[in-house]
Amino acid sequence: MKFKKIILALACLSSPLYADQDQQLKSEIQRLQHQAEDLQAQLNRLQKQLANHKSSQQKHEQQAAAKPAEPKSKPTTKSGAAIEEKYHSSKVEVHAPDAHPESISFYPTALIADNRVVTYIAGTPVVSSPFLGDRPAFDGSDYIVNISSINRDVRLMQQRRRLYRAYQKIGYPIPNMPIISLSGKTEPAATFNNPFRSTNTDGDITLGSSELDIAAALNENVEAYIAIAYDESPPAIGPRVNNSAFNLNMGFVNIGNLDKSPLYFTAGQVYVPFGRYSSAMVSAPVTMNLARTKTRPVIFGYKSQADTGPFAAFYGYRSDTTLGRSGVGGVNLGYIFGFDNDINGEIGGGFITSVADAGGMQSTGSNVGTTFGGFGSITNGNENVRKTKAADVHGHVGYDRYNLTLEWVGAVQSFRPQDLSFNGQGARPQAAQAELGMTFMAFNRPASIGVGYQWTKEALALNLPKQRYIGVFNISIWKDTVESIEYRHDIDYGLTQFANGAAPPGLVNLPTLGTGKSADTVSAQIGVFF
């Protein structure tokens, strides 16, 4: 009897609960019925549209059969609209990596239909470098604009190979349209110094280096590249901003596919592969000032298909100097090595049949009507000089977060005294640098320091110091930027030393005299890269 009462009480209490559940189920059933009715209505509309489309298509086909279209012209309706081509519907898919996107470097994105790229999700591939989602370094050091100006064609060819390998790795067909990559930089800088030939402290604020790079990978084998750079040098006459102009810094076409062959070809306006000129400093090393040569060569090269191994380049171009034969050539040889991902580096050497076309030989920066201004100067120079051979030896090694750079470059024969002189004799200019660097984290940001020593010999006429002690601190406070501060101590040639160079016909340049003094310069720079 007692249990019957308990059961009766539970039944009375649970009846409202079941009633509520029944009401919820009825509401859910009604909502699903409304959705089903809406879907059925949509299906009926689509079937009606499909029937109308088939009827219209049959009518057009009958008209076309009765009255064929004229050759070489599309059939049209009475209204003049072109008849649509037959088509079919296909599934559109996007390949996604199995791993989390943060764990891989490349993840190109495209819409695929019938195993063909219909379109890239971002439209035609115009991307900011590095190519297609390659995760860049925090300081922007791996952007195209920061690739070494020497052998930039080889570096882009390697990048192009990594790009197309990424497509194959994730299962995408090779794009049938050019992939255009944009890169660039702006580097405003401020300097404070006390020059050799002045007792007053001087200072300047300038835009510094600014450049826009465009690399177009047409396919796996061919790439075109142009770099447009800002000319920061002040004009000879008028306000300094009057020379705020852009010019073609580099432009070339590279043909090669390292997956198929170690051979490649490059032609255009580039820095010839002579020297390395690697430095972490704000100021260019004296080796670069002396011998880096920009011209319009053809280059035939060899690059090991592995990341390490030998490389070679043979090149030729027409010289700017006019005495003797116009042709100049050279060779660059080297080897890239790496051991257990801890030690890596490069050793190499080069030879060029004339160093007179180098930027530091063509323009020394002297004022108009004063000392030797370079062979290319209209008022203080002359291109009618003998071609003088030069050589280069360089090495770079990195271990963990430390790196060491060594380089020597110089003429292997003397210039004629009337072309370039030192103490009344034909000059044989040389330059060398040694630089030690270390990377670390500062304030939770990537940073580096570097110290170096540089020297020159018989380069007084080129306005280069005899010795240089230099140090720099770099830090990336914000992504894709590098903030730098540099101290430089230059020592001039002695008081008893003098030099000169070729002058226009009938004129003589003022001699460049050593001062025996030293100069100190502090530079601050903000580099912004994309």
Curated annotation (Swiss-Prot):
Keyword Signal: yes
Keyword Disulfide bond assigned: no
Protein keywords: Coiled coil, Signal
Biased composition (Low complexity): 63-79
Domain of life: Bacteria
Residue runs in coiled coils: 20-66
Annotated protein name in UniProt: UPF0422 protein lpp3030
Family according to the record: Belongs to the UPF0422 family.
Region described as Disordered: spans on this chain: 50-81
SS bonds (residue pairs): none
Range of residues in the leader sequence: 1-19
NCBIfam families, alphabetized: LbtU_sider_porin
